[in-house]
Amino acid sequence: MNARPARGTLAAVVDARRFGAVVFDMDGVLTDTARVHFAAWKLLFDDELAHRASGVEAEPFELEDYLRFVDGRSRIDGVEAVLDAREVHLATGASSDPPGEATAWGLANRKDELFLQALKRDGVHAFATSVVFVRAVRAAGLATAVVTASSHRSDVLLAAGLDGLFDAHVDGVDAAEFGLAGKPAPDMFLAAAARLGVEPVSTVVVEDAVAGVTAGRRGGFGLVVGVDRTGSASAQAAGGADIVVGDLAELRVVGLRSRGR
């Protein structure tokens, strides 16, 4: 039996004859909203941590913190991970807590408020090369889905002009409704594959967050592709990516598959 190639070393090819579906993360893979999320998180934590620094200059929230503790995770999981890392102790609170309340949920809701303000002010842009790749996947006969921890999936896809390119969606609203654990647990990806009617082993996962790459590997998906826009290729490969590319322009679709629809 041949050994599986080292993570991150497979040819940058999706063979439509091997797979039935491709599941995409949204922020950072399809849309240039990861930078908006980071900016909102930075505003939140730079203010919050400075407020709690007790006369000592607080260490700012940096991109490395975003990638390590927040990227790909739900808002509440991200807040709690950062607070734990900074040894800040707040009650969890409830999802109904108003933005800015001195609870983890209050901070999570404040982050959501900041993100929506930036989204309204700056708009949403899709990565053109990602749109080309999604269209190539569909032209090859593969089903497509979006998986995101965001509760604003429909608004973002609509604003980016991507709402008609996917057969299924699993987002933060679904996660709350159905009790799906966030990444790095594979629950949301597994739910997307189930909605498409395709087994995980016959499904490709495309992710930019290490937590999402790990979720794809833990879920037993047939191919896990990491998209490295932030210098995290090594971490993605270590997390389980079979292929790591800097942009989806580097990933080719070969072969054809009848979708049977």
Model-identified regions with their sequence ranges:
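Residues that cap or flank secondary-structure elements
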Residues: D71, H125, A145, L180-P184, ...
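N-terminal helical cap/lid subdomain that shapes the substrate entry/recognition surface
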Residues: A6-L10, D15-M26, L30-A128
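N-terminal-biased segments
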Residues: A81-L90, T144-V146, S151, G172-V173
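Ser/Thr-glycine-rich phosphate-binding loops at phosphate-binding pockets of nucleotides
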Residues: V29, T33, T148, G212
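Conserved SAM-binding loop
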Residues: L30, R68, V146, V205-V206, ...
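Short, flexible loop segments at the rims of nucleotide/cofactor-binding pockets, characterized by
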Residues: L119-V124, V147, G222-V224
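Asp-based, Mg2+/Mn2+-dependent phosphohydrolase catalytic module
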Residues: M1-G20, R135-A136, S151-R261
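Catalytic-core regions built around general acid/base machinery
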Residues: T129-A140
